[in-house]
């Protein structure tokens, strides 16, 4: 077998095992439903926060949430530390914080700010005793997994964060009874929007339809 293909298959196999662990973790905790309940009731936005690769996972999750009916904005922890905290609406918004270790120093002041101001925090981490989960209103503990390669960069853990975020977005969509029509209202471009357009939305109507008498000549007289 080609060496490159062998490495690729090993990588995917490792990540499949990580996803299996994530799937099994849902059977051991009711916390996920608490997250859905909380976010479905907020009057503002779900602000997704992370550092490094966790922020990039949060960025994708935030985009999916917004596409499927849950208004959301993503922030890097660094941006929040330098004025971004002003974007948080007290008594309206909720923070969804991603961090594998839950110990990123950039999160400390943000979590303290949220706690002081009564802003709900949903912490998602792989470390049960982490700073993030200690500060969190709802604690989501994802399984610790083997990273592909030599564990030099987040791989399997990033995949689990993305899958968990997709699960949340779809669950909220179902809870809110989000329809194809509403999806198109927020997704005006691309093949997805085109495929969901109904004929009555683009057809000519009334005076827009060019009528002509049946006894008219086709050539000008």
Roles of regions detected by a PLM:
Residues 31-35, 80-84, 220-221:
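Short acidic active-site motifs
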Residues 1-41:
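An N-terminal, well-structured beta->alpha segment
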Residues 31, 131, 160, 191-194, ...:
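Short, contiguous, pocket-lining structural segments
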Residues 23-29, 94-103, 212-215:
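Short, glycine-rich nucleotide/cofactor-binding loops
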Residues 25, 194-221:
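Bateman/CBS regulatory modules and CBS-like beta-alpha motifs in cytosolic regions of diverse proteins
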Residues 9-18, 65, 195-205:
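Short, basic/glycine-rich phosphate-binding loops at helix/coil junctions
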Residues 134, 148, 174-206:
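Internal, active-site/partner-interface "lid" segment
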Residues 40-176:
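Glycine-rich phosphate-binding loops that contact phosphosugars or nucleotide phosphates
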């Amino acid at each position: 077998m080609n060496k490159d293909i062998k490495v690729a298959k090993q990588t995917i196999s490792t990540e499949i095992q990580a996803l299996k662990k994530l799937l099994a973790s849902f059977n051991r905790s009711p916390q996920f439903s608490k997250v859905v309940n909380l976010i479905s009731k907020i009057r503002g936005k779900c602000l997704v926060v992370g550092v490094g690769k966790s922020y990039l996972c949060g960025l994708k999750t935030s985009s999916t949430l917004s596409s499927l009916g849950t208004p959301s904005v993503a922030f890097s922890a660094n941006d929040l530390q330098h004025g971004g905290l002003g974007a948080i609406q007290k008594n309206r918004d909720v923070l969804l914080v991603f961090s594998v270790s839950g110990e990123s120093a950039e999160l400390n002041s943000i979590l303290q700010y949220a706690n002081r101001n009564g802003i709900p925090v949903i912490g998602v981490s792989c470390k049960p005793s982490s700073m993030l989960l200690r500060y969190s209103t709802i604690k989501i503990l994802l399984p610790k997994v083997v990273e592909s390669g030599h564990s030099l960069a987040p791989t399997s853990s990033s995949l689990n964060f993305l899958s968990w975020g997709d699960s949340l977005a779809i669950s909220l969509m179902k809870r809110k009874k989000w329809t194809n029509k509403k999806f198109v209202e927020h997704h005006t471009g691309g093949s997805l929007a085109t495929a969901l357009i109904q004929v009555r939305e683009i057809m000519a109507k009334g005076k827009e339809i060019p009528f002509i008498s049946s006894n008219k000549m086709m050539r000008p007289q």
